[in-house]
């Protein structure tokens, strides 16, 4: 009987005349790609934890998250990895320890970059409904992204997006006025400035500042090749947000409200010299410039959509002449007879309208991924009172989320694992890309 031996992501197989059989029997088949990805990740990203028992607690916590059905409380996680005895040690690991979560988040970003290079950072708000008053940051507030009131916590996740992976790697919790000390004395323990208040600091941070600082701190800590930031700034300060990213020399593509006030700077276009105009009116005046662009719909895998898109050079009015910069106003029409469905501003002025439209869909990819996976890894499930405990929990949950992404890519039918493709070139800021040339980091059309 003729046989041929081959290897794929499931292990080593022999192709017999009677069919496919694993070499060495069924035990050689990879039966848990997500678990294996989790072990590999933990080995790589938990190295900043000095003690071996801490690294083991971290691995147990990640594995427990992946194995737990329903709410990912410390008690439920412990039931998967050792019961009551494990519960006490895991509780101390998350809520009572002093390890720094930022090096783990940075290591996670670098691990992912080695596997599947970064396309863009996406800032995604995450509302965490909660009753009671004991958890840090809980309040009754208006969510500008959802357009409704809710009671609970408001966090911002900074998501790593690539052609293969969509996963959070950074977090910041919004702390309203008077809430900074809501977690009690533990809130004043030393914490990394990138992820919360400085030790003993009583500083109010606006919703806008929280969103932008979360992105900037994550990117600074990672020190990776420059990639665009995609975020939604409707309902928060358009001008101040864009200025902060410009000062950080970080390219940005920001969704804005239709009433945002801008100046047309192209003498050949309607609205030039007319003063400050609403963004929707500027775009309605240039409907003749619209072109059709096809894009993949991440909400419906395999589906392709077509939108009309136009881009106009504009300026954000600013009292300081030094801050008056030209940007592109990008409009998308899903219905050509109506007003633009989405409006964006960007300093990626060398990219084509088609490339910019497809880049905006990174936000749609993250929204689709978050709606399907945030609950699966318990990102909203921390029930403790301290800010540091919250950060440690969401850090471990982010590692679990990344393991699920990587493991699912390995276990997919016909999948070839997540071997690293060739690294794309560094992107300068502003993106120095000739019109018509598609940068290597852009998500495929």
What are these regions (language model features)?
Residues 98-178:
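Active-site-proximal, Lys/Arg-enriched surface segment
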Residues 192-265:
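Domain-level cores of phosphate- or acyl-group-handling catalytic modules
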Residues 146-222, 340-341:
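Electropositive, glycine- and tryptophan-enriched low-complexity nucleic-acid-binding patches
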Residues 166-167, 171, 179-180, 257, ...:
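An anionic, glycine-rich sequence signature occurring as long contiguous blocks
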């Amino acid at each position: 009987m003729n046989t041929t031996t081959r290897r794929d992501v499931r292990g080593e197989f022999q192709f017999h005349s009677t069919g496919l059989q694993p070499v060495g029997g069924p035990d050689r088949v990879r039966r848990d790609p997500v678990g294996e990805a989790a072990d590999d990740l933990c080995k790589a990203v938990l190295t900043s934890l000095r003690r071996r028992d801490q690294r083991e607690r971290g691995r147990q916590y990640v594995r427990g998250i992946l194995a737990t059905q329903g709410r990912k409380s410390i008690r439920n996680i412990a039931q998967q990895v050792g019961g009551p005895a494990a519960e006490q040690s895991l509780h101390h690991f998350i809520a009572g320890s002093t390890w720094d979560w930022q090096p783990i988040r940075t290591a996670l970003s670098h691990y992912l970059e080695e596997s599947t290079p970064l396309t863009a950072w996406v800032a995604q708000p995450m509302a965490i409904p909660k009753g009671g008053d004991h958890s840090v940051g809980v309040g009754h507030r208006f969510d500008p992204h959802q357009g409704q009131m809710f009671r609970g916590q408001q966090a911002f996740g900074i998501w790593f997006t690539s052609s293969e992976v969509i996963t959070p790697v950074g977090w910041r919790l919004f702390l309203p006025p008077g809430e900074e000390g809501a977690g009690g004395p533990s809130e004043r323990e030393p914490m990394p400035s990138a992820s919360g208040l400085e030790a003993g600091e009583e500083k109010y941070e606006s919703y806008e500042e929280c969103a932008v600082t979360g992105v900037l701190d994550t990117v600074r800590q990672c020190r990776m090749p420059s990639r665009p930031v995609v975020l939604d700034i409707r309902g928060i300060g358009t001008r101040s947000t864009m200025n902060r990213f410009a000062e950080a020399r970080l390219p940005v593509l920001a969704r804005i409200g239709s009433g945002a006030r801008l100046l047309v700077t192209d003498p050949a276009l309607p609205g030039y010299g007319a003063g400050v105009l609403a963004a929707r009116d500027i775009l309605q005046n240039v409907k003749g410039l619209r072109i059709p662009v096809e894009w993949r719909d991440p909400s419906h895998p395999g589906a392709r959509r077509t939108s009309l898109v136009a881009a106009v050079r504009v300026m954000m009015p600013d009292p300081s002449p030094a801050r008056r910069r030209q940007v592109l106003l990008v409009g998308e029409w899903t219905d050509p007879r109506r007003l633009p469905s989405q409006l964006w501003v960007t300093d990626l002025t060398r990219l084509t309208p088609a490339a910019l439209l497809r880049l905006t869909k990174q936000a749609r990819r993250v929204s689709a991924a978050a709606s399907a996976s945030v609950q699966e890894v318990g990102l909203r499930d921390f029930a403790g009172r301290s800010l540091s405990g919250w950060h440690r929990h969401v850090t471990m949950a982010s590692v679990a989320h990344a393991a699920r992404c990587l493991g699912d890519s390995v276990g997919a039918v016909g999948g070839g694992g997540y071997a690293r493709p060739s690294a794309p070139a560094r992107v300068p800021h502003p993106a120095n890309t000739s019109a018509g040339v598609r940068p290597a980091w852009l998500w495929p059309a």
